[in-house]
Design a protein with these regions (language model features):
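Conserved Radical SAM active-site core
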Residues: 2-36, 44-152, 156-164, 172-176
Length: 176
């Protein structure tokens, strides 16, 4: 049984940089890219929900229906990777919100980021709950074979009913 559809509002967020850095020893990566703020999947356990509260929005339904994207993401990434002082290290994509949520079909933000990664042969990892990741197999496959990319698909449970309750708008476990 599918979750009730939400009307999604998509708004641009004009970032100055695209690669976020962290120095926490508790996180398995020190560089990340999140093409979106907010996530249409609506996972009840999501730890990223407070990011909307920091913007004066609800971490509940606003987080699921008011999505922000970075239209200049690919250009910003290309600028950062081209800097003479850039030190190449693996970048994690999707550590905060899913890079392949439904709105990605329209924006292709994640796809444009992957195209830059491919041109620069920039190592990365990516995680999702969406079957939309298969769309980008033409990039992920060759880069994976070259040891430049790792792709992860998260499956919380194989129980479809429980998955729908926990992750109402994510791809079903069977499809993942």
């Amino acid at each position: 049984e599918a979750a009730a559809p939400l009307r999604t509002t998509l708004s641009p967020e004009h970032a100055r940089t695209i690669i976020a850095r962290n120095s926490s020893p508790d996180v398995g990566f020190d560089r990340s890219i999140n093409p979106y703020k907010g996530c249409e999947h609506g996972c009840i356990y999501c730890y990223a929900r407070p990011s909307h509260a920091w913007m004066g929005l609800s971490p509940g339904l606003d987080f699921e229906s008011r999505i922000f994207f970075k239209p200049e993401a690919a250009r910003l990434l290309e600028q950062e990777l081209a800097k003479p002082r850039y030190v190449c290290k693996r970048i994690h994509i999707g550590g905060n919100t899913d890079p392949y949520q439904p709105i990605e079909r329209e924006t292709k933000s994640t796809r444009s980021i992957l195209e830059v990664m491919q041109r620069f042969r920039q190592p990365f990892s990516i995680i999702t709950k969406s079957v939309l990741i298969a769309r980008d197999a033409d990039i992920l496959g060759p880069m994976g074979r070259d040891g430049l990319c790792s792709a992860y698909v998260s499956i919380t449970t194989l129980d479809r009913k429980l998955a729908r309750a926990m992750e109402p708008r994510a791809s079903t476990p069977t499809k993942r």
